[in-house]
Amino acid sequence: MAIILGIDPGSRITGYGVIQCNGRSQIYLGSGCIRTASDDFPYRLKQIFDGVSEIIRQYQPNFFAIERVFLAKNADSALKLGQARGAAIVAATNADLPVAEYSATQIKSAVVGTGKAEKTQVQHMVQQILKLPAAPQADAADALGVAICHFHTSQSLVSLGGRANTRTYGRYR
């Protein structure tokens, strides 16, 4: 039995989702959003750190998974998103949690089956996979998707005996 905390980072809204994994089943434990209230950016980072730390204290997860930064058109937005991720990751490392990072494409592929899925498709599939009565809010659904992605990735590694295929075909690019 393992508990996975998934994080969808944002400088204004950071989504979180917590699932428990028993064998091949995934059980919903909780989800929501950390909403930062201040215009003072360093204080918003503190709110993210404190919020993630509290969620870790509340749910006692074994694993922490977070979405990787994507390339944004606006460099300032990308930097702020990276700093928000950093605040969440520091909260996880303070609790001695192993940190896993996944791209948006990996997360969408694990949850929906295609890396080009829309947000509404992710919400719908998260609802179906976790047997929720209603679709979660977009940021919380994305965070639950991160946790589901980590579950599927770790299950794949277990079935491979903890190692990937070492043969490589073709050229490295």
UniProtKB/Swiss-Prot annotation:
Its EC number is 3.1.21.10. Mg(2+) 2 binds at E67. Mg(2+) 1 binds at D8, D139. Keywords: Cytoplasm, DNA damage, DNA recombination, DNA repair, DNA-binding, Endonuclease, Hydrolase, Magnesium, Metal-binding, Nuclease. One of its GO terms (biological process) is DNA repair. Its cofactor is Mg(2+). It is found in: Cytoplasm. The keyword DNA-binding applies. The active site is at D8, E67, D139. It is an enzyme of class 3 (hydrolase). It catalyses: Endonucleolytic cleavage at a junction such as a reciprocal single-stranded crossover between two homologous DNA duplexes (Holliday junction). Binds 2 Mg(2+) ion per subunit. One of its GO terms (molecular function) is crossover junction DNA endonuclease activity. One of its GO terms (cellular component) is Holliday junction resolvase complex. Homodimer which binds Holliday junction (HJ) DNA. The HJ becomes 2-fold symmetrical on binding to RuvC with unstacked arms; it has a different conformation from HJ DNA in complex with RuvA. In the full resolvosome a probable DNA-RuvA(4)-RuvB(12)-RuvC(2) complex forms which resolves the HJ. Belongs to the RuvC family. The RuvA-RuvB-RuvC complex processes Holliday junction (HJ) DNA during genetic recombination and DNA repair. Endonuclease that resolves HJ intermediates. Cleaves cruciform DNA by making single-stranded nicks across the HJ at symmetrical positions within the homologous arms, yielding a 5'-phosphate and a 3'-hydroxyl group; requires a central core of homology in the junction. The consensus cleavage sequence is 5'-(A/T)TT(C/G)-3'. Cleavage occurs on the 3'-side of the TT dinucleotide at the point of strand exchange. This is Crossover junction endodeoxyribonuclease RuvC. It comes from Shewanella woodyi (strain ATCC 51908 / MS32).
